[in-house]
Amino acid sequence: MGSRDHLFKVLVVGDAAVGKTSLVQRYSQDSFSKHYKSTVGVDFALKVLQWSDYEIVRLQLWDIAGQERFTSMTRLYYRDASACVIMFDVTNATTFSNSQRWKQDLDSKLTLPNGEPVPCLLLANKCDLSPWAVSRDQIDRFSKENGFTGWTETSVKENKNINEAMRVLIEKMMRNSTEDIMSLSTQGDYINLQTKSSSWSCC
């Protein structure tokens, strides 16, 4: 059997300085720097994965500048995306509350071919820092109320939960690409990455 290629466009959005560029660099190149310059407009990276013996996944990662939510360009950037990651800084409550605006902007401009919202993970980044400005209960409630696929804490600096979270997103996109699109009865739940990379805490 010949190999099958899957190409997915994944948006990485959120306020400035929450770690979007760091996430893209960590995931695509396994590198981290404290000295990234602020993204202007949009930046791109490619991640290629041997998903199975006969399937290759190519992720086109779109790192969208935090200021772009206030421009009309987001509709162009969002076009044809298969999934999204919305990030916030757990030590900054404003970036958390603004995640709702990013999600609303996304949902108003982008849907799957069947009209459903695209899969979207909420990443609580910089979890290695303290104190947190929001509680886990707040994040959990927020994720469910705003229609996220799920959420988890991440530390790009310490490379915590990055590959695991992205795997959950890829699995969701792969299911969608085979037209097995079913709404989860429970959405927005915390993604338990410790027990199994693709498990949901509600299961």
Curated annotation (Swiss-Prot):
Signal peptide span: none
Modification Phosphoserine, positions: 72
Cell membrane keyword on record: yes
Residues marked Cleavage (site): 41-42
Localization annotation: Cell membrane; Cytoplasm; Cytoplasm, Perinuclear region; Golgi apparatus
Keyword annotations from UniProtKB, A to Z: Cell membrane, Cytoplasm, Cytoskeleton, Differentiation, Golgi apparatus, GTP-binding, Lipoprotein, Membrane, Nucleotide-binding, Phosphoprotein, Prenylation, Protein transport, Transport, Vacuole
One Gene Ontology term from the biological process aspect of the record: positive regulation of T cell receptor signaling pathway
Membrane topology note: Lipid-anchor
Pfam families: Ras (PF00071)
Keyword Zinc belongs to the record: no
Motif (Effector region): 36-44
Subunit structure: Interacts with LRRK2 (via the N-terminus); this interaction is direct and stimulates kinase activity.
Function: The small GTPases Rab are key regulators in vesicle trafficking. Essential for maintaining the integrity of the endosome-trans-Golgi network structure. Together with LRRK2, plays a role in the retrograde trafficking pathway for recycling proteins, such as mannose 6 phosphate receptor (M6PR), between lysosomes and the Golgi apparatus in a retromer-dependent manner. Recruits LRRK2 to the Golgi complex and stimulates LRRK2 kinase activity. Stimulates phosphorylation of RAB10 'Thr-73' by LRRK2. Regulates neuronal process morphology in the intact central nervous system (CNS).
Protein name in the entry: Ras-related protein Rab-7L1
